[in-house]
């Protein structure tokens, strides 16, 4: 526990943090990667270049300082970050490195004096221990469950299937022939790659796209413009190739009773965790209402349409609606979509009027903000809306 003086000293730095903004974390990362370049093998350097990770870390630091007297308020954020850390295989000793550079950054940017540095050192130590302990629990859970493992495990690509002009699915089975750990629908795999020509090891998280079967995993990858890893997977990864995986993780997952109605809302590749949820509901014979609402640019980039239709047919109460923002003439001729333009949930209000319905969202942040606002305006309770950001977390 932190003493009152330490808490007061940390809280007194909040105005300075707010004034500085993400420039603080930019300095921190630049310093850390200069002095500890080995950490480039762990961090997603693409998120460093576009500034997303720097913004996410700044928001986390500011939230900690603001809630330092009420740590339980931070537990949802801690869980999200700890789950992600396990896919990077973060170790306790790496927290010492981060702490060293955080304090040095505060000193170099603000020269706040030893009292402030000591207070932040104590505060960081408390938070680091929270993460270390929770991550140890997750590592132990992953290693001890049936089919689980520690660290990375070699998996072979056994199928590679284009699903649209931009999305390709990969089916993976363990090289050792053993069973694989189950997961909750909505969670992701940590994929570790360092192909020839890559300057650093790259680690990515890809959502699992079907119900666990104990034998292998399926992910789907969108080709991102300029994306080093996604383009390598699309262009160079082949059936028979071996990749390293970390056990499934993630705090975004569906856990509902059979009589709980569910709405799955997605855009683009955001449908991937929803597929695992839909597959799970279909194979469980879910009896309550299930809605599938999806937005795509057009038919060329609309993946898994046939699979969704087939899964929906096995559910007794299923409604699907697809929006194409800019459908082609071929799309119109085929009748592959229901509405043109942006997703408008007000026209489907009757499909989710049950106050117990749970809503799961995934897609670009702007889309999720747009969809979540519509739901709230239609009377949906905020606590019934669950969402996942691909990349560093953002608040809707």
UniProtKB/Swiss-Prot annotation:
Residues 1-136 form the Globin domain. It is an enzyme of class 1 (oxidoreductase). Pfam families: FAD_binding_6, Globin, NAD_binding_1. GO terms for molecular function: FAD binding; heme binding; metal ion binding; nitric oxide dioxygenase NAD(P)H activity; oxygen binding; oxygen carrier activity. One of its GO terms (biological process) is response to toxic substance. NADP(+) binds at residues 268-273. Keywords: Detoxification, FAD, Flavoprotein, Heme, Iron, Metal-binding, NAD, NADP, Oxidoreductase, Oxygen transport, Transport. Residues 147-396 are annotated as: Reductase. Residues 150-255 form the FAD-binding FR-type domain. Its EC number is 1.14.12.17. Its cofactor is heme b; FAD. It catalyses: 2 nitric oxide + NADPH + 2 O2 = 2 nitrate + NADP(+) + H(+); 2 nitric oxide + NADH + 2 O2 = 2 nitrate + NAD(+) + H(+). FAD binds at residues 188, 204-207, 389-392. The record marks 84, 388 as: Influences the redox potential of the prosthetic heme and FAD groups. The record marks 29 as: Involved in heme-bound ligand stabilization and O-O bond activation. Binds 1 heme b (iron(II)-protoporphyrin IX) group per subunit. Binds 1 FAD per subunit. Heme b binds at residue 85. Belongs to the globin family. Two-domain flavohemoproteins subfamily. In the C-terminal section; belongs to the flavoprotein pyridine nucleotide cytochrome reductase family. Consists of two distinct domains; an N-terminal heme-containing oxygen-binding domain and a C-terminal reductase domain with binding sites for FAD and NAD(P)H. This is Flavohemoprotein.
């Amino acid at each position: 526990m932190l003493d009152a003086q330490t808490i007061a000293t940390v809280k007194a730095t909040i105005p300075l943090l707010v004034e500085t903004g993400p420039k603080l974390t930019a300095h921190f990362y630049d310093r850390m990667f200069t002095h500890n370049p080995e950490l480039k093998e762990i961090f997603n350097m693409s998120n460093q270049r576009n500034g997303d990770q720097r913004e996410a870390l700044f928001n986390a630091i500011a939230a900690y300082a603001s809630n330092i007297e009420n740590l339980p308020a931070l537990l949802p954020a801690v869980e999200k970050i700890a789950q992600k850390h396990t896919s990077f295989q973060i170790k306790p000793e790496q927290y010492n490195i981060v702490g060293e550079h955080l304090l040095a950054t505060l000193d170099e940017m603000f020269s706040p004096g030893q009292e402030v540095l000591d207070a932040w050192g104590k505060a960081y130590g408390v938070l680091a221990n929270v993460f270390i302990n929770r991550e140890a629990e997750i590592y132990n859970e992953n290693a001890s469950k049936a089919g689980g493992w520690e660290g990375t495990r070699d998996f072979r690509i056994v199928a590679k299937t284009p699903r649209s002009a931009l999305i390709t699915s990969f089916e993976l089975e363990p090289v050792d022939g053993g069973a694989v750990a189950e997961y909750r629908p909505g969670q992701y795999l940590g994929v570790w790659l360092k192909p020839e020509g890559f300057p650093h090891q790259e680690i990515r998280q890809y959502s699992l796209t079907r119900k666990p079967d104990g034998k292998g995993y399926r992910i789907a990858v969108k080709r991102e413009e300029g994306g080093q890893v996604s383009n390598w997977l699309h262009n160079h990864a082949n059936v028979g190739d071996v990749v390293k995986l970390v056990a499934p993780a993630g705090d975004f997952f569906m856990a509902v009773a059979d009589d709980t109605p569910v709405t799955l809302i997605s855009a683009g590749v955001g449908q991937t965790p929803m597929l695992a949820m839909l597959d799970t509901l279909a194979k469980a014979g879910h009896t309550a209402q299930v809605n599938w609402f999806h937005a795509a640019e057009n038919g060329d980039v609309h993946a898994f349409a046939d699979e969704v239709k087939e899964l929906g047919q096995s559910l007794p109460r299923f409604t699907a609606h697809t929006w194409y923002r800019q459908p082609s003439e071929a799309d119109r001729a085929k009748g592959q979509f229901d509405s043109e333009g942006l997703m408008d949930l007000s026209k489907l209000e009757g499909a989710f009027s049950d106050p117990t319905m749970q809503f799961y969202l995934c897609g670009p942040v702007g889309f999720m903000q747009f969809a979540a606002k519509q739901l709230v305006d239609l009377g949906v309770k905020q606590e019934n809306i669950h969402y996942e950001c691909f990349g560093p977390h953002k608040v809707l």
